[in-house]
């Protein structure tokens, strides 16, 4: 699914975003080499490290990722050639990207955080926010609270992400974690203030 988005400052980049499950249609397009040019791949978690390495190698494109709550294998086998951006504000060309891994705490498993813990992680980045001035894209596994999330404990979003959107006004907030069958690209998007919150379960292609 390709989406052309409207930004105040276009970056002229084509970004492939993936999350949660390996989409057969994407795999076929990658293997057939008919996906078109991709400048950057972004993973929002819960994907096998081998799959991320496959995408990175076949598309010969940098790949940034955050881990999801089911990415227990990453402690032993990180995706080769890919870059973990959790708790970092990184730059790709003109795009400033913030990464935040994991889900809300629900049973004490890996990559689970209370809202207070996540808020502390975000606060610890204050110098990066000050130095780079702007956040264009936030990449997370879980959604913000009451935006695309659910009411069972595992799939609740983070209140701290809502505060982050209100304070930093990123152009994009890209997440996974919430599995849903989308009929059109527009069904993935909720606009909050000036931020496009996008559920990228499966995959999307953003033209930014």
PLM segments and residue spans:
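N-terminal active-site segment of His-dependent metallophosphoesterases
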Residues: 1-56, 127, 131-134
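Conserved catalytic scaffold of divalent metal-dependent phosphoesterases
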Residues: 17-25, 71-156, 202
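Active-site environment of divalent metal-dependent phosphoester hydrolases
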Residues: 22-26, 47-53, 69-75, 105-109, ...
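Short, structured coil segments at secondary-structure junctions
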Residues: 58-60, 80, 192-193
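A short, gly/pro- and small-residue-rich
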Residues: 59-70, 158-161
């Amino acid at each position: 699914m390709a989406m052309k988005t409207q930004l105040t400052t276009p970056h002229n980049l084509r970004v492939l975003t993936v999350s949660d499950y390996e989409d057969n249609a994407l795999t076929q397009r990658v293997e057939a080499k008919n996906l078109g040019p991709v400048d950057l791949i972004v993973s929002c978690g819960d994907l096998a490290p081998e799959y991320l390495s496959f995408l990175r190698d076949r598309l010969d494109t940098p790949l940034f990722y955050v881990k999801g709550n089911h990415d227990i294998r990453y402690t032993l086998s990180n995706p080769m050639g890919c870059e973990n951006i959790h708790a970092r504000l990184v730059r790709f060309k003109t795009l400033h990207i913030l990464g935040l891994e994991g889900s809300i705490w629900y049973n004490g498993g890996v990559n689970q955080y209370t809202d207070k813990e996540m808020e502390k992680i975000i606060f610890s980045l204050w110098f990066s926010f000050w130095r780079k001035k702007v956040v264009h894209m936030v990449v997370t596994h879980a959604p913000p609270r009451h935006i695309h999330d659910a009411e069972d404990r595992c799939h609740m979003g983070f209140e701290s992400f809502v505060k982050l959107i209100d304070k930093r006004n990123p152009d994009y907030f890209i997440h996974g974690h919430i599995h849903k069958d989308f009929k059109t690209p527009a069904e993935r998007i909720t606009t909050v203030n000036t931020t496009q919150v996008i559920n990228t379960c499966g995959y999307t292609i953003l033209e930014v």
